[in-house]
């Protein structure tokens, strides 16, 4: 089918009409849209928020709160009393008991202590697969250097 000579002219006019509609449509006359989007908008000055209690009363209330000093362990618990009696029976004094209690309570909190459990995991260092994490500890030598 041969194209009629009017068809390209109709397509050109339709394209021109679409272009004009896009340019003169809503917001098209008011200027550059990108410039308008990037332009700062005028915002009203924020008003001071209303609070139920005035500042002096709030500070007075918060200043009166006192936190009790927390014990390392609860001496009222029967198992702690039993540990204490066992330590005294074995010949340790209270200072030694407190040292040991703080050691065992803090042992899991810092996992990076050199002579703690972190480095002293004994794998066969010549095994084919090695430990699961290659960055966790040294392996591959025939000697476990952490034992020296």
Curated annotation (Swiss-Prot):
Q: Name where it mostly resides.
A: secreted
Q: Which family does it belong to?
A: Belongs to the augurin family.
**What organism does this protein naturally occur in?**
Homo sapiens (Human)
The GO biological-process annotations, alphabetized, read as: anaphase-promoting complex-dependent catabolic process; cellular senescence; central nervous system development; G1 to G0 transition; regulation of cell population proliferation
Q: Name one GO cellular component term.
A: apical plasma membrane
Name the source's superkingdom.
Answer: Eukaryota
**One Pfam family hit:** Augurin
Signal peptide location? 1-31
Propeptide residues are 32-68, 133-148
Q: Where in the cell is it found?
A: Secreted; Cytoplasm; Apical cell membrane
Report which gene this protein is encoded by.
ECRG4
Q: In which tissues is it expressed?
A: Expressed in the brain, with expression in the epithelial cell layer of the choroid plexus (at protein level).
What's the name of the protein? Augurin
Residues in a coiled coil are none
Key words of the record: Cell membrane, Cleavage on pair of basic residues, Cytoplasm, Membrane, Secreted, Signal
State the InterPro entries in the record: Augurin
Q: Any idea what job this protein has?
A: Probable hormone that may attenuate cell proliferation and induce senescence of oligodendrocyte and neural precursor cells in the central nervous system. ECRG4-induced senescence is characterized by G1 arrest, RB1 dephosphorylation and accelerated CCND1 and CCND3 proteasomal degradation.
